Structure formats: structure tokens, C-alpha cells
Amino acid sequence: FFSFKLNSQPNANVTIAVNSSDTTEGTVSPSSLVFTSSNWSTTQSVIITGVDDSLDDGNQSYTVLLGAASSSDSNYNSLDPTDISVTNIDDDTAGFTVSSISGVTTEYGGTATFTIKLNSQPTADVLIAVSSSDTSEGTISPSTLTFTSTNWSTTQTVTATGVNDSAVDGNQSYTVLLGAASSSDSN
């Protein structure tokens, strides 16, 4: 927050509008300050609140815009206080969260599943290829996960299904492979 007061007593009310240059990064309250001949020397506070936008967009600068004073007192009318520069510190990091696998694949159709979701909202679609290191032992569905700016925080399920290969080969290991994320979002 910041505080504001007048330097001298006005002979009429003085109103100063308060706005944010980018309400997607920060908001202000109240939207105006009103000084009278009785409260002119009392500081009034403006609360600045950063917006948590879920985007890994780095620290973002914006401005608290203080409008020109409006008053019938000619000493104050149209005086324009200095705007205030503010930075919204970003707390979002691009990446994804993968759950532990649940279940065991078998040659009789046994399945194992895990989920994956993004850690921050992308600015463009994010595609992740999913495959098996040995398709003769296990298949993977789906083969591609698509995360958008609207479904990024919703978990998507990947299912591994064992393949009956009719060979007496005991337990066989294979790996579910997650490809590198593909997106025009630079994060």
C-alpha cells in the first residue's frame, strides 16, 4: 500500500482517481481518494494487490495511475500527482507433475495408470508424446497428451496395458516414455 495526503487545506473537495494500468497483474482500492477541508492533512491509504495469474510470465511491471485532481478549488484542480511503478512478482514455474503409477500390467490385460498435469498455465497448447519402450510387452494410451490454457491444471490419465505375447519369458520390464513438451509457449 501507499499513503497520500494534501500539502495544504483546500477550499473545496479534491478528488483523485486511482487505477491500475494492468488489472491482470494488480488491482487498487479504493478507486478514488476524496480530500475535504477537514481531512486534507490525514493520510489516506491505497491498497495495491498483486494478481496470481497461474502464468509463468516472469515478474510483470505495471503502474498505479493517479488521475489529475478534480476540484472547484483552482489551486488543486488539474494537479496531476506522479504515478507509481509497481512489480508483480511471479510465483509460477513451468513444468509438470506426474503421479505414482497405480496397478501392474500383465499378459492377461492387466493395466497400470498414472496421471500428469502442468504446474502453470501455458499461453499456447502443450503436447507431450507418450510411448512404450517395448510395445511387444506393453502398450500406452493415449499416445499424446494435449494441455491447453483451460485444461492445464486438470490431471490426464495415461494407461499402460500388458500384451499377451505367448512367449514363456517371465516378468518383463518396459518403460513408459514421456517425450519433451512441445509448444509455442517459450516456457
Give the location of each predicted region.
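Short boundary segments that mark the start of a structured unit
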Residues: 1-187
